[in-house]
Amino acid sequence: TSGDKVLAYTTTYKNNPFLDDGYIKGLQEMLIRNPRRAKVAVLGEWGISEGLVFENFDVVDFDINKKIQQIGKTVHGMDFGFTHDPTTLPSAVYDEKNHELWIYGELYKTGLLSEQIISEVKKRNLLAATIHADAASPMTIAELKHKGMRRIKAAKKGPDSVELGITFMQSLKIHIHPSCTHTIEEFNTYVFDQDKMGKWLNKPVDANNHIIDAIRYSLEEYYGEAPAEFKTYNISL
């Protein structure tokens, strides 16, 4: 669409060469299962998916190596899964000065044993990187550390850790590289919960967040105990 001073160009999954057949099939199924959300998430129409936790993100094709050289600070997180839930490892450049997060890499696979996780980490040249991982899996963390991931560490978990992490992420401008298809999907489907009357609750649904959880872990050193007046999610509907 265009006007006197505005030019808007809409792209959809049909324009993204990075998407695999399985991901495309999922988007096409969304058109049938949830056409209201698919209008935004799949067809690119104006608006937002209702109840989204994060509205502060975009998908942009940036030069990864150049961005790393410019800013210099990369962050990595890991969430563990196996049969139904995936093991994830997102990588991002964090621009602390400008409050921007540039997500450029992702691992998203089910059925990974520790040896296979090590192999995936090696492929990404992250064996020596600091990786903040899910504290609920101390045995897996110990195995990975023993097998060469010397700088993997358990993320801190407390009564407010999820809330603090999400609030901090909401304060950033988040850019996602189009090659990170699972990350894009999660940011487009991670929503707040509702009660039986349809009222929005002050907590997200615990789903579609395997990469998002790992991103929270990766950023934990940048947020601490928040003042009481800030201990709330930012809900904008």
State each model region's role:
Residues 69-94:
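Gly/Thr-rich phosphate-binding beta-strand-loop-beta motif of the actin/hexokinase/Hsp70
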Residues 11, 42, 89, 131, ...:
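A residue-level signal for conserved active-site and pocket-lining positions in enzyme catalytic cores
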Residues 90, 97-204, 225, 229, ...:
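Mg2+-dependent endonuclease catalytic cores in nucleic-acid-processing enzymes, primarily RNase H-like
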Residues 7-9, 76, 132:
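Hydrophobic/aromatic beta-strand patches that form the interior of the parallel beta-sheet core
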Residues 206-226:
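Acidic, Mg2+-coordinating catalytic module of metal-dependent nucleases/exonucleases
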Residues 16-78:
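ATPase catalytic-site recognition across NTP-hydrolyzing enzymes
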